[in-house]
C-alpha cells in the first residue's frame, strides 16, 4: 500500500501576517497532484472563490462547536464519510477548534494519531508567533511568518 507518511503541518504567525494566503496557495497547488479528496475547514465562506472547485469548503461556524473535543469529533465525522480523503486544511485553527486561549499541544498530538491511523494530512494555520508555541509542536512548523 501507500507508504507515504501522513503528517500534521503548521503555518504559524501573528494575525494579519498572511497565513491564509500560504494555506490557499498550498491547497491549490496540492490539488493538482492529489488523486483523493481535500477538505478545507474555515470560520466562514469568505475564501470560497479562491479555492479550486475540487476542494470542499466547510464553514465550521455553522456547526455549534464549543470545545476542542467537539472539533475533533467533527473532524472524525468528516473522515468517516469520505474514504478518499487525503488532506484536510484548517484555516484559523485556534478559532475553529475553540482553542483561542488554550494550549494546543494535546489537540495537535491527537491530530497526529488520527493522521497516522486514517492516512490523512492535516495542514493548520495557527495565529500565534512561533515563540509562543509549545516545544512539542515546533517540528511540525512548515512556514513561520
Model-derived segments and spans:
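Short, small-residue-biased leader/transition segments that mark boundaries at the very start
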Residues: 1-4
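Conserved P-loop
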Residues: 8-78, 133-136
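Generic beta-sheet signal
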Residues: 9-11, 38, 85-90, 122
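Amphipathic alpha-helical interface surfaces
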Residues: 19, 67, 71-74, 85, ...
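N-terminal targeting/trafficking signals and adjacent low-complexity tails
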Residues: 81-82
Amino acid at each position: 500500500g501507500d507508504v507515504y507518511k501522513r503528517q500534521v503541518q503548521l503555518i504559524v504567525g501573528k494575525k494579519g501576517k498572511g497565513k491564509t494566503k500560504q494555506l490557499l496557495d498550498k491547497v491549490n497547488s496540492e490539488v493538482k497532484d492529489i488523486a483523493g479528496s481535500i477538505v478545507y475547514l474555515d470560520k466562514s465562506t469568505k475564501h470560497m472563490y479562491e479555492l479550486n472547485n475540487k476542494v470542499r469548503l466547510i464553514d465550521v461556524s455553522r456547526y455549534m462547536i464549543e470545545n476542542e473535543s467537539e472539533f475533533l469529533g467533527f473532524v472524525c465525522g468528516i473522515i468517516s464519510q469520505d474514504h478518499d480523503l487525503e488532506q484536510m486544511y484548517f484555516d484559523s485553527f485556534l478559532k475553529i477548534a475553540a482553542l483561542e486561549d488554550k494550549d494546543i499541544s494535546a489537540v495537535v498530538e491527537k491530530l497526529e494519531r488520527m493522521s497516522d491511523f486514517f492516512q490523512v494530512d492535516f495542514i493548520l494555520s495557527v495565529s500565534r508567533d512561533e515563540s509562543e508555541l509549545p516545544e512539542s509542536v515546533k517540528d511540525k512548523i512548515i512556514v513561520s511568518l
